[in-house]
UniProtKB/Swiss-Prot annotation:
Keywords: Allosteric enzyme, Carbohydrate metabolism, Cytoplasm, Glycosyltransferase, Pyridoxal phosphate, Transferase. GO terms for biological process: glycogen catabolic process. Its cofactor is pyridoxal 5'-phosphate. Gene3D superfamilies: Glycogen Phosphorylase B. The lineage of its organism: Eukaryota, Viridiplantae, Streptophyta, Embryophyta, Tracheophyta. One of its GO terms (cellular component) is cytoplasm. This is Alpha-glucan phosphorylase, H isozyme. It comes from the Eukaryota. The keyword Glycosyltransferase applies. It is found in: Cytoplasm. Its EC number is 2.4.1.1. Belongs to the glycogen phosphorylase family.
Length: 838
């Protein structure tokens, strides 16, 4: 290998043997790529980086063969195909996943050993693709893995963000955001498709043609260029695509005259605006420009994807003669992952009417039979509402279409259900508020989709009973539940190989990796002392690995013999990281007041918290700062730091999760009941034998049912109690627990430094008012939370009981595979079938 360690080279000259499974041939192929697919000059050769690039290129050879076979097979069979549109994907590292799914992990490990390298070290060179932020993006990626594993004809569509959301640094000031330059070196996993380019128009105006038809003209036109990422299934030949769009301007939009005149910015204005579209995920939208940019991103994804879908439909149908538009919904299913891709609805209508010449009724029939919508939230601020003025400016033709959909919807309801007249203001798509008229994107989705689903049973029940109750009375069969799931490949098989090996040994099969329900058979061994010893040993190996990682990234030394207590998720007041840290503060204060002998009787604990706070979300950033300040004080206090450590884990992403989750023993899912649609990290922790402390919210409800109430540390108000508790608070009826007051007072005493935490603490105080009145019920749930934590401490001391609970947690996780979720989508929403590559 060029510039590498010569002594370990396999001696033969490198040859490309892309499909061989012999380690010597693979080593030769890796060497071949190092020489002939160079990503570095020979003078700047970094062995690990270069071995990663060459190994990835070598694995990609196999993927491309399977990818082409899959595409040709789908083309020949012409099945109905699903297209999954999402603003976010959180793929994680592709190399680990590819060698695992292709079942070539050991062969590649041996090949790299022959070259003097370790696969584990080579894998570490890959940066996570920064294409998402939280659960929404990770769910989309789990779904893609399951679609391929189940041999379903399905593609994902997204945007190729240059800098992602942001990279999180933790400094003395708290969270600092810098660009996440994941493409800084290169990504060997994406293939640019220079032949797949579509025009995307913004602004302009609508022209009425002599025929009476309408045409959107003028404005500015950018190009959408496709980058494809292969999505291999587990032990199957099917390899699907994630197609990511990048924005660019055409060469005609570069003004050479102005450039040569020294007017460089003016010469390339459109090029500059094109670069903005895929620069970052969720650009700040406090300004008019920010709102326009977000809307541009959403439309860019919708329009490019639809043009591509229509082109493929025509190509496949025309191969049989000519295409019939009535066939479109029989060949295409489009799933909108939340409201971000809602503009798919008016854009499909526009393409069918204005470009293909169909009438309104036929276009509407096709659109409403093709599109389905997944709702992910009941949080009012997350239900998108766009200013009508901004929409008219950017997308004038689409606003005409939305107006017509709204008008026809209102007319239908008034004629068929006059009893709903007083509900129309909240049901209609266009809100004609005199001061700030908006478009309700969720309403547009519900009116225009054939199916609407929630993502956990409780969430779907709340949607039907509250958020969309009036629509349910009109379309009772339109609403479904599809409880979320996770891929067992990434979330246990690959990230916790020791535990996976034990499960396979005791079940006498590895079929559980694709049939997770088989885990239930572990229950019969839940008291077996031999399994207990193996289980505890695997958990300890994962904890030691995690302790090394924490020392490496934070400099904090943690004890693997302490209870590892982890809360990792987006920082948000409803997810209540504040409840967690207030509990930690109270624990610290009590430990501080104990004698050394008393401390020895406590359960030592390491509390880890991680997640990103949106750059403009001030209170969330204050919570990050508080966690880091508490950690600084607690970890350097010699009286207590053998019994309590507090760590903020920076820049939480998929790869960090793959380290944290296998090493966790207690995981906190403590949102205010009724506010978390589902949650999926709870499923990942439970699958890895981690016990949950949580509220009856989202998928917690179903996890508790599956693993058994005795194996779940429950606390807090229930979803149906929350509205009354908020009313009681407004009426001054809330009496705070003394422990809660003590924890807040301890912060105010300056115990954790001079930072002004009053604005954060005041959000928990008073009875009402903006940013006050403890909307998320931290104070109400604090006493039952502390009592549940005391139960955790007691349970952890009884090792036999704890390990049994851990085994039962894993064995009860069979329902939460994304394979089950996707099978249900395929049968009950998309109406698509397996299309296995022979």
């Amino acid at each position: 290998m060029e510039g590498g360690a010569k002594s370990n080279d396999v001696s033969a000259a490198p040859i490309a043997q892309p499909l061989s499974e012999d380690p010597t041939d693979i080593a030769s192929n890796i060497k071949y790529h190092a020489q002939y697919t160079p990503h570095f000059s020979p003078f700047k050769f970094e062995p690990l980086q270069a071995y990663y690039a060459a190994t990835a290129d070598s694995v990609r050879d196999r993927l491309i063969k399977q990818w082409n076979d899959t595409y040709l097979h789908y083309d020949k069979v012409n099945p109905k195909q699903t297209y999954y549109l999402s603003m976010e994907y959180l793929q994680g590292r592709a190399l680990t996943n590819a060698v695992g799914n292709l079942d070539i992990h050991n062969a590649y490990a041996d090949a790299l050993n022959k070259l003097g390298q370790q696969l584990e070290e080579v894998v570490e060179q890959e940066k996570d693709a920064a294409l998402g932020n939280g659960g929404l993006g990770r769910l989309a990626s789990c779904f893609l893995d399951s679609m391929a594993t189940l041999n379903l004809p399905a593609w994902g569509y997204g945007l190729r963000y240059r800098y992602g959301l942001f990279k999180q640094l933790i400094t003395k000031a708290g969270q600092e955001e810098v660009p996440e330059d994941w493409l800084e070196k290169f990504s060997p996993w994406e293939i640019v498709r220079h032949d797949v380019v579509f025009p995307i128009r913004f602004f302009g105006h609508v022209e009425v043609l002599p025929s009476g038809s309408r045409k959107w003209v003028g404005g500015e036109v950018l190009q959408a260029l496709a980058y494809d990422v292969p999505i291999p299934g587990y032990r199957t030949k099917n390899t699907n695509s994630l197609r990511l769009w990048e924005a660019k301007a055409s060469s005609e939009d570069f003004n050479l005259f102005l450039f040569n005149d020294g007017q460089y910015d003016a010469a390339a204005q459109l090029h500059s605006r094109a670069q903005q579209i895929c620069a970052v995920l969720y650009p700040g939208d406090a300004t008019e420009n920010g709102k326009l940019l977000r809307l541009k991103q959403q439309f860019f994804l919708c329009s490019a994807s639809l043009q591509d879908i229509i082109a493929r439909f025509k190509e496949r149908e025309d191969g049989k003669g000519s295409h019939q538009w009535s066939e479109f919904p029989k060949k295409v299913a489009i799933q909108l992952n939340d409201t971000h891709p809602t503009l798919t609805i008016p854009e499909l209508m526009r393409l069918l009417m204005d470009d293909e010449g169909l009438g309104w009724d036929e276009s509407w029939n096709i659109t409403t039979r093709t599109i389905a919508y997944t709702n992910h939230t009941v949080l009012p601020e997350a239900l998108e509402k766009w200013s009508q003025a901004v929409m008219w400016k950017l997308l004038p033709r689409h606003m005409e279409i939305i107006e017509e959909i709204d008008k026809r919807f209102v007319a239908t309801i008034m004629s068929e259900r006059p009893d709903l007249e007083n509900k129309m203001p909240s049901m209609r798509i266009l809100d004609h508020n005199a001061t700030k008229p908006v478009v309700h994107m969720a309403n547009l989705c519900v009116v225009s989709s054939h199916t609407v689903n929630g993502v956990a049973q409780l969430h779907s029940d709340i949607l039907k009973a509250e958020l969309f109750a009036d629509y349910v009375s009109v379309w009772p069969t339109k609403f479904q539940n599809k409880t979320n799931g996770i891929t067992p490949r990434r979330w246990i098989r690959f990230c916790s190989p020791e535990l996976s090996h034990i499960i396979t040994k005791w079940l006498k099969t590895d079929q559980w990796v694709t049939n997770l329900e088989l885990l239930a058979n572990l229950r019969e061994f839940a008291d077996n002392s031999e399994l207990h010893a193996e289980w505890e040993s695997a958990k300890m190996a994962n904890k030691q690995r995690l302790a090394q990682y924490i020392l490496h990234v934070t400099g904090v030394s943690i004890d693997p013999n302490s209870l590892f207590d982890i809360q990792v998720k987006r920082i948000h007041e409803y997810k209540r990281q504040l409840l967690n840290i207030l509990g930690v503060i109270y624990r610290y204060k009590k430990l501080k007041g104990m004698s050394p002998e008393e401390r020895k009787n406590t359960t030592p604990r390491t509390v880890m918290i991680g997640g990103k706070a949106f750059a403009t979300y001030t209170n969330a950033k204050r919570i990050v700062k508080l966690v880091t300040d508490v950690g600084d004080v607690v970890n350097s206090d010699p009286d207590v730091n053998d019994y309590l450590k507090v760590v903020f884990v920076p820049n939480y992403n998929v790869s960090v999760a793959e380290m944290l989750i296998p090493g966790s023993e207690l995981s906190q899912h403590i949102s205010t009941a009724g506010m978390e649609a589902s949650g999926t990290s709870n499923m990942k922790f439970a699958l890895n034998g981690c016990l949950i402390i949580g509220t009856l919210d989202g998928a917690n409800v179903e996890i508790r049912e599956e693993i058994g109430e005795d194996n779940f540390f429950l606390f807090g108000a229930t979803a149906d109690e929350v509205p009354q508790l908020r009313k009681d608070r407004e009426n001054g009826l809330f009496k705070p627990d003394p422990r809660f007051e003590e924890a807040k007072q301890f912060i105010r005493s300056g115990a954790f430094g001079t930072y002004d935490y009053n604005p954060l603490l005041e959000s928990l105080e008073g009875n009402s008012g903006y940013g006050r009145g403890d909307y998320f019920l931290v104070g109400h749930d604090f006493p039952s939370y502390m009592d549940a934590q005391a139960r955790v401490d007691e349970a952890y001391k009884d090792r036999k009981r704890w390990i049994k609970m851990s085994i039962l947690s894993t064995s009860g996780s069979g329902k939460f595979s994304s394979d089950r979720t996707i099978s249900q989508y395929a049968k009950e929403i998309w109406n698509i079938a397996e299309c296995r590559v022979p």
